[in-house]
Amino acid sequence: MTSNIFARPHPRRALALMIASLMGFNTLAQAAEQAVATVPVQSTDTGYSLTLKQLGRRDTMNLQGVESSDSVNFDIRADEVVKGAQLLLKYSYSPALLADLSQINVLVNGEVAASLPLPKEGAGTPQEQLVQIPAHLITEFNRLSLQFIGHYTMSCEDPLHSSLWAKISNSSELKVQVEPIVLKDDLAVLPLPFFDKRDARQVSLPFVFATAPDSAALEAAGALSSWIGGLASYRGATFPTTLGELPAKGNAIVLVQTADAMDIHGVAVAKPAGPTLTLIANPNDANGKLLIVTGRDGAELKRAANAVVLGNPVLAGNSVVITKLDTLAPRRPYDAPNWLPSNRPVRLGELIEQQKLSVSGYNPGAISVDMRLPPDLFNWREEGVPLKLKYRYTPQQVSTNSSLLIGLNDQFMKSVALPSVSNLGGGQTLLDQLKKDESLPREVTTLLPISSASPKSKLQVRFMYDYIKEGECRDIIVDNMRGSVDPDSTLDVTGYQHYIAMPNLGVFNDSGFPFTRLADLSESAVVMPDNYGTDELTAYLTVLGRFGEATGYPATAVKVVQAKDVQSVADKDLLVLATAANQPLLKQWQQYLPATSDGEQHQFLLSDLPRYVRSWISPDPAANQHPANTGITFKGLSNSTWLAGFQSPLKSGRSVVLIASNQPQGLLEATNALIGGDDYKDSIQGSLAVVQGTQISSLVGDEQYYVGKLNYFKFMQWQLSQNLGWMLLITFLGLAVVTSLIYLSLRARAKRRLA
């Protein structure tokens, strides 16, 4: 694949639209041709389908030259066996190809599943073919490869001629039919079947509360949902909730807080002897499993849940009683497993598997390293993050344009020449190194500007080799070009301090900040509505799942309260869920809110934020200020869902993020927006954002306070840069002091001379 190093800007809607939203190999190939069919994909209850994009292909596969290939991986769940599979291939190809000599081969794990001819009549137009994939080719871990073989003339040809191309759309669809396998009732299989890393689909895991949950039960459930959310990672996770009702199909987590034996829809829960974990079959579905988490009180229920999320690798058996669970050390700020460490340089080998750091070919795809930066890195007047890149490459005998490209989030950062043997400096020493393995070790240091990064960023390194043409009938591609990045290459953000202007819903959306500053959420609290139902519970668990996705650590220390107890968590960052009149804080804190909804009456503040491109954030917070300058009030029965951020009225420096809707189901729109996806063209930004279906409208960006800490010298620089008057005064006083010292020194010297 050829990755695009340059970013594509996203269009932004105008303010008027925002207001409107408020209102409303040939031999084998020939043998495999019989596997090709043209019937449409049929949906079945025992299978699923995934696009190549869902399997990790971000863009179109561009296959060029006389022979090229690209691939994606797909895996099969541990509790499923494959009955059959099809690939609905969407592709196009060059009109210049010779039909008798050109084809696209579909391979699974190196075996040809089908060979598609490329006739003249279909050239240059979108094509679709349904390829039958034999079930025996599919194993637990699989590689689906698309190989293009192309020729445009019977005589001598240029192997990289521009007419040799085929494109595979990433909307091509892999459909798999499966049969379930019953797993044993053993806690040792956890996190299976509730999460399987081989499944690329979004996780949907029901939670069942045996009785109406109290705060402790919600804290236990939050730890579990954040654990699953962290495992789900890029897939996303939702947690539909019921009270006392088991799902008709599939898996679920059941939380039971009772001192006595009880029955839950046919599931007999024995009288607990302490925090208990039990794995059983779902009585409604023999292929489903129930993880029953039991405690005699809230403390025991939380201990049982924490035992699952922290100790699942050592659990075994159908049922266990947790006798002790100790926390050996408290979490430290910014130590989330998913975040780039800010107290030491980090090796690239810690962020990506070593085999993914090597590529081959003249124009291979980019080596992409995913990294999550702490969202509050203060980058004012900082040159950038030092990247010490160690790499090896195969030097060509002669070349002029071979280079190593370094990019960040599809933006070009630096180009480094890859000199040929004839252009190498270093004489015999370098040539001696080449004799060892025909690759040459090199090193380069560059600075990556944080202003070009987001909390979820992608470092891209791409080797590009110059193809030297020898002349007609002499050109041939020898696939001996190799490039690799040393896993000991380092990124170092230790020079950055933590300081950020708030409120900022963008960093909440991307990283759950400021709640995720401590990975276990020990300085965070969730304020639930007074009379919450299953919609509010689902929203709460889904948001906690998002926090787990951001940190990679379960929220074992989150506090859950209601409005009447909010003073008890005054020293914490607060996530407030509100539906209609169920949240008293909407009235108590009305003066701090940029939006309100009371029945049919809705009021929103507006600014010029929608007119700005928010994909770029200035390192100067003043440039990001878009305070409210307009207000609108209207009546309507439609659903109104919004997110707002503001400083906590209970303690300065603490933050509140409010997720509100005039209808309980509206909270699910907000949580879906946090998960995001292809249906969402915009993301949540600013200090006020409205969600209408898949449309997100960020209305206000009013950053009023700061969280974090700067050292004294940096803080003084920052403050003086923000206040011209103070800078002039300090400059004047400094000049006065220096002038006075010079005057006194000269006067003393004159007195000594006269004496």
Swiss-Prot record:
Protein's membrane topology: Single-pass membrane protein
A Pfam family matched in the record: BcsB
Location of the protein in the cell: Cell inner membrane
Keyword tags: c-di-GMP, Cell inner membrane, Cell membrane, Cellulose biosynthesis, Membrane, Transmembrane, Transmembrane helix
Family that this chain belongs to: Belongs to the AcsB/BcsB family.
Cited function: Binds the cellulose synthase activator, bis-(3'-5') cyclic diguanylic acid (c-di-GMP).
Name of this protein: Cyclic di-GMP-binding protein
Organism of origin: Pseudomonas fluorescens (strain SBW25)
